[in-house]
């Protein structure tokens, strides 16, 4: 039987974290190419360190002349990301950082296994397992610890960028421990925030005084109590941040990107990957399905797994676990999912409208638990499959 009284912790990192700088650049490259050609193939990886950004991987457009033209725009794309994040420090500045572009054309051997041909449907871009998760403990149907860890950093980024707290730097991390009573989140027992700051004279107490009002307005009323333990910049000064402080790589924050450790993870990162790659698209589909199961009232909590083989279109397996909260047997939900959504790579992309430049915005503050947007962004957060699922169980 599942535990109902416990404390669970999740962390988030800001858009200025070194790994998130890399995720942002990789997704910006993807967006630029997919805006030119919706079926563009992209697998872009980024490495960032002091005064240096290296971008590599595989890309493909049907028009090689256009591809060559876009290779000349990579430097500009990367600098625009760094500028928007806010890096203007001596050893990592959007104007002076050295950008190296090592992107090259995608392997024809990969393409032949993935592309549709004749009566053969498009296959998955790789083998793998992908998980989706949803829980009704928050309005976004996300676990509370990760949802509010993101919210804290997103709010601090807002006040940094709008000039309210210009003393904050782009690099930051948050972590909250949430106590559950009868399976519901009720209070924050501890809160950790480490944020870069531009004034060397500021102490940990000074930083707490600056950020505490914004943290309090972000969390649900009553969750911060007199017993909540605060750790704000616990090591003291945090002036040198971002890739100058620690090297960054694309794809190193996969738990931050998903459910904060509250659900399994298949291991595949998202950023820089076009939607033919099921690491990304099938994980989005799994979240979409799990969220719709919960939104439909079929369960209070749902974990869903999909699996694929490279070159094979249909998923090899679909697994549902409602953690003893289901209104119907889990097997019935699995059957309903097969009826309600085409889970081939092309079916997922069509259903969720993934062949659009909607990825750069996902690179920080979580791929899940965000509001669907009018241009198709975060389409996997829609709850438009609920009636179909209820009718199919």
Curated annotation (Swiss-Prot):
Cofactor binding mode and count? Binds 2 divalent ions per subunit. Binds 1 potassium ion per subunit.
Amino-acid positions noted as binding L-methionine in the UniProt annotation, renumbered to this chain: 58, 106, 246, 277
- EC numbers on record: 2.5.1.6
Q: Where does Mg(2+) bind?
A: 19
Task: Keywords in alphabetical order, please.
Answer: ATP-binding, Cytoplasm, Magnesium, Metal-binding, Nucleotide-binding, One-carbon metabolism, Potassium, Transferase
The residues that hold K(+) are 45
Q: Where does ATP bind?
A: 17, 171-173, 237-238, 246, 252-253, 269, 273
An example Gene Ontology cellular component term from the record?
Answer: cytoplasm
Name of a matching Pfam family: S-AdoMet_synt_N
Query: Which superkingdom, per the lineage?
Result: Bacteria
Q: Where in the cell is it found?
A: Cytoplasm
Q: Identify the cofactor(s).
A: Mg(2+); K(+)
Q: Which InterPro entries match?
A: ADOMET_SYNTHASE_CS, S-AdoMet_synt_C, S-AdoMet_synt_central, S-AdoMet_synt_N, S-AdoMet_synthetase, S-AdoMet_synthetase_sfam
Q: Which GO terms describe its biological process?
A: one-carbon metabolic process; S-adenosylmethionine biosynthetic process
| Residue ranges of the region described as Flexible loop | 106-116
Quote the pathway field: Amino-acid biosynthesis; S-adenosyl-L-methionine biosynthesis; S-adenosyl-L-methionine from L-methionine: step 1/1
Q: Which Gene3D superfamilies match?
A: 3.30.300.10
What's its catalytic activity?
L-methionine + ATP + H2O = S-adenosyl-L-methionine + phosphate + diphosphate
Give a GO molecular function annotation for the protein. methionine adenosyltransferase activity
Determine if Nucleotide-binding is one of this entry's keywords. yes
- Family designation: Belongs to the AdoMet synthase family.
Relate the protein's function as given in its record.
Answer: Catalyzes the formation of S-adenosylmethionine (AdoMet) from methionine and ATP. The overall synthetic reaction is composed of two sequential steps, AdoMet formation and the subsequent tripolyphosphate hydrolysis which occurs prior to release of AdoMet from the enzyme.
Q: Which HAMAP family match?
A: S_AdoMet_synth1
Oligomeric and partner information? Homotetramer; dimer of dimers.
Protein's name according to its UniProt entry: S-adenosylmethionine synthase
> Which lineage is the organism of this entry classified under, starting from the top rank?
Bacteria, Pseudomonadati, Pseudomonadota, Alphaproteobacteria, Rhodobacterales
Q: Which gene encodes it?
A: metK
């Amino acid at each position: 039987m599942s535990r109902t009284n416990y404390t669970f912790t999740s962390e988030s990192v800001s858009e200025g974290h070194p790994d998130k700088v890399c995720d942002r650049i990789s997704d910006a490259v993807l967006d630029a190419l997919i805006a030119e050609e919706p079926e563009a193939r992209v697998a872009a990886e980024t490495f960032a360190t002091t005064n240096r950004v290296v971008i590599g991987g595989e890309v493909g457009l049907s028009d090689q002349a256009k591809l060559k033209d876009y290779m000349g725009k990579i430097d500009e794309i990367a600098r625009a990301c760094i500028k928007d994040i806010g890096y203007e420090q001596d050893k990592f500045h959007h104007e002076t950082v050295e950008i190296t572009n090592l992107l090259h054309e995608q392997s024809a051997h990969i393409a032949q296994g993935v592309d549709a041909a004749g009566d053969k449907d498009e296959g998955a871009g790789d083998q793998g397992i992908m998980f989706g998760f949803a829980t009704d403990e928050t309005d976004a149907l996300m676990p509370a610890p990760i949802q509010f860890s993101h919210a804290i950093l997103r709010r601090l980024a807002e006040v940094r960028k709008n000039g309210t707290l210009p003393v904050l730097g782009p690099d930051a991390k948050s972590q909250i421990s949430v106590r559950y009573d009868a399976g519901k989140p009720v209070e924050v027992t501890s809160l950790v925030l480490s944020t870069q700051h531009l004034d060397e004279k500021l102490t940990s107490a000074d930083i707490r005084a600056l950020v505490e009002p914004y943290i309090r307005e972000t969390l649900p009323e009553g969750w911060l109590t007199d017993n909540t333990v605060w750790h704000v910049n616990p090591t003291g000064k945090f002036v040198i941040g971002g890739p100058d402080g620690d090297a960054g790589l694309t794809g190193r924050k996969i738990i931050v990107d998903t459910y904060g450790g509250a659900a399994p993870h298949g291991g595949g990162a998202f950023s820089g990957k076009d939607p033919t790659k099921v690491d990304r698209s099938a994980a989005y589909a799994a979240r979409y399905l799990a969220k719709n199961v919960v939104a439909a009232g079929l369960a209070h909590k749902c974990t869903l797994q999909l699996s694929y083989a490279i070159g094979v279109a249909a998923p090899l397996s679909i697994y549902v676990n409602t953690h003893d909260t289901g209104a119907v047997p889990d097997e019935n939900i699995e059957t309903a999912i097969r009826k309600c959504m085409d889970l081939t790579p092309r079916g997922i992309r069509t259903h969720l409208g993934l062949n659009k430049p909607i990825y750069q915005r996902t690179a920080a503050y979580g791929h899940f638990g965000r509001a669907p947007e009018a241009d198709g962004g975060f389409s996997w957060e829609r709850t438009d499959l609920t009636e179909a699922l209820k009718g199919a169980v």
